[in-house]
A protein has these predicted regions:
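Glycine-rich phosphate/diphosphate-binding loop of Rossmann-like nucleotide-binding domains
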Residues: 1-41, 292-294
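Short alpha-helical segments enriched in small residues
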Residues: 230-400
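Short beta-strand elements
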Residues: 138-140, 211-213, 335-343
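N-terminal beta-loop-helix "entrance" segment that forms/cooperates
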Residues: 27, 31-59, 305-307
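Accessory alpha-helical/coil subdomains and C-terminal extensions
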Residues: 141-143, 149-216, 223-226, 230-232
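Proline/glycine-rich low-complexity loops and linkers
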Residues: 42, 48-55, 59, 76-172, ...
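Conserved hydrophobic helix-helix packing surfaces used for dimerization/oligomerization
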Residues: 4-6, 147, 270
Length: 400
């Protein structure tokens, strides 16, 4: 199997001052191309350290993606490190210099002399275009390893990997068939509870079951060779059956996006009233393009379930909305949810049975519960379902 590695560079990455989102993205992207990373390293802005690790990994990796260090400042050392590791000098890439000058001119700016550095590449380098920025990439062969050098700006990095680097890898290597990955996302059951229920299922050859907990959800992931796709799809039905009502969506689209699409398909507008969730519902649904008619965040106040239900019923009528959803304040470990619909208003009063979680996590959990109520109503299900440490203690319905 092709050994693919990544090297992230920069003091700010090494010292944890920024999160290395490029590494996480590349690992996931390459995995789904059939190119799982075998190693990731991080090195700061030190020329000797960079040269040392380039030479070291050149003896072990078939492909190395180097990220960062292609800017115009003194601490951008990747091109010099690559040239030094190969024992050659830097040469000016005249065509890229002209491209940078054009880039700045079109934006009404004069290119700083320091940007010239971004057109200086190792003498033997293969130029790699950057269609969205001023830091071009390049590739060099060092011992057994083909090394690709890329800018650290995420938007530039992703474009270059997808449109410049991956096609080159497909040309030069015989790549394996990408694996099949089937995902189910659950809400309301613990990881250990799900594992205990699912461990009895028989997995096809080469197929693994993975669990990824990201409060308040748990993703169940079946990964295996394409030759087992039919068996995996059959197994996925068994996983859904065992996981039961805790399954809230399939794939990677996300619950807000799926709700948004369903609202649009059924021509429902939505109005929101939030207290404890502090605008999380509005944020998630607006990012997904949901047809929101009106949103409000109001200070927490103690209210009965009936008060919450009547309030959201009136709000739906006043805004001529198709649907209206409310989350009350959090008082004495209790809060209310209410959903006003053309069929009536449905409301739940719940108790949060654990307080060990931070305020932010409890808000995330309650926002997800509200979204799940909406999802279940749209699917024609009872709005109440099992939610682990959240206990439904009262429910009510207001007729139209």
């Amino acid at each position: 199997m092709l050994k693919v590695e990544m090297l992230s560079t920069g003091d700010e990455v090494l010292h944890g001052q920024i999160v290395d989102t490029n590494a996480a993205w590349l690992a996931d992207f390459f995995f789904h191309q059939g190119l799982p990373l075998s190693r990731r390293n991080t090195v700061g802005d030190n020329l000797d350290d960079l040269v040392t690790i380039l030479r070291e990994r050149s003896q072990h990796a078939d492909v190395l993606i180097v990220n960062g260090g292609l800017g115009p400042t003194s601490d951008d050392l990747s091109a010099l490190a690559a040239a030094t590791a190969k024992g050659e000098g830097l040469v000016l890439h005249e065509a890229w210099l002209k491209e940078m000058e054009r880039y700045f001119h079109e934006r009404g700016r004069v290119m700083a002399p320091s940007n010239r550095k971004q057109a200086e590449l190792p003498a033997s380098a293969e130029f790699i275009n950057n269609p969205v920025g001023t830091a071009c990439g390049f590739a060099v062969q060092l011992n057994r390893c083909l090394m690709f050098f890329t800018p650290g700006v995420p938007s530039e990095f992703k474009v270059m990997v997808e449109h410049e680097i991956l096609p080159r890898l497909r040309e030069r290597f015989s790549l394996p068939q990408p694996p099949v990955c089937l995902r189910l996302t659950t809400f309301g059951r613990s990881e250990s509870d799900l594992a205990q229920s699912l461990d009895t299922l028989q997995l096809p050859p080469g197929v693994t079951m993975g669990y990824r907990s990201s409060m308040p959800i748990i993703e169940l992931k079946l990964t295996g060779p394409a030759s087992e796709q039919q068996a995996m799809e059959k197994l996925c039905l068994d996983v859904k059956r065992v996981a039961g009502q805790s399954v809230i969506f399939e794939g990677t689209e996300g619950l807000p996006a799926q709700i948004s699409r369903e609202l649009q398909n059924r021509q429902f507008s939505l109005t929101l009233s939030e207290q404890f969730t502090g605008g999380l519902l509005a944020l998630q649904l607006s990012r997904a393009g949901a047809p929101l008619l009106a949103c409000e965040v109001v200070p927490s106040q103690e209210e009965t379930l009936a008060q919450t239900a009547h309030w959201i019923t009136e709000r739906r009528a006043n805004h001529f909305a198709g649907l209206a959803l409310a989350v009350s304040g959090f008082e004495n470990e209790h809060l209310n949810f209410a959903l006003a619909t053309p069929d009536g208003t449905f409301a739940l009063r719940v108790r949060f049975s654990t307080t060990r979680y931070s305020l932010a996590i409890r808000q995330e959990v309650c926002a997800m519960m509200a979204l799940n109520m909406l999802r279940r109503w749209l699917n024609g299900q009872d709005i109440a379902s099992e939610h682990g440490w959240i206990e439904v203690i009262e429910s009510m319905t207001l007729s139209v």
